[in-house]
Amino acid sequence: CLKGTEHKWLDLYVLFKNWILPSSAPLETELVGIKFFTAPIQAKAAKADDSVSSQARYHQALKNRYSAEIEVVRGYYTMDTVNAKVVDLTNPERRFRECETTLVWKLEEKQSDVNLALHAYHDAITSSVEQVVIVTNDTDIAPVVEMLKKHTSVTVGVVIPTRKHVRYPNGELTKHADWTRTHITDEELAGSQLPPVVMGKRKPTIKPESW
């Protein structure tokens, strides 16, 4: 939901503590921690020259400001060349196996979904939390929500990471949740920004100019 906005320098803790949870969770909620599942951008796949450094700055800013409250859990990207079928533009109905093959780049994020599933289930069965809130619209996470509801006592909320009327919640994901937040508003994003300079133990982290 941050694509194309000026709100990438997002304060996740403020967003959830001040906006998302008070307006969405069915019961009074105490925010005990945030786990941010991500993967470092590969330089050769970056969309801009400063993408890698900007992401690293953001992760460092979160660590500096919320060392106890936010845990950044990293996966990784793989980038390979693979053969892929090309749609025949002159005959879009042409059968898949009859279409020509070409070599393309395939960029995949690894481990993030697995990490999310394991952390959510671990925190639920060890009674570390009474409620798990998952931010996604990915159907791959639907089994996680279903398992949490079937085999643990935690309340499960789902927040769809989109601005209003951009994407609709996936039914396979939300049907198992206790509650769903369908979007995040521009006002909430704007009101949840880190300061331009985030102080650290050794040196400050400065918001990227492109952000």
Predicted regions and their residues:
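Domain-level signal for Mg2+-assisted phosphodiester chemistry and nucleotide/NA-binding surfaces
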Residues: 1-92, 97, 101-106, 151, ...
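Nuclease catalytic cores that cleave nucleic-acid phosphodiester bonds
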Residues: 76-211
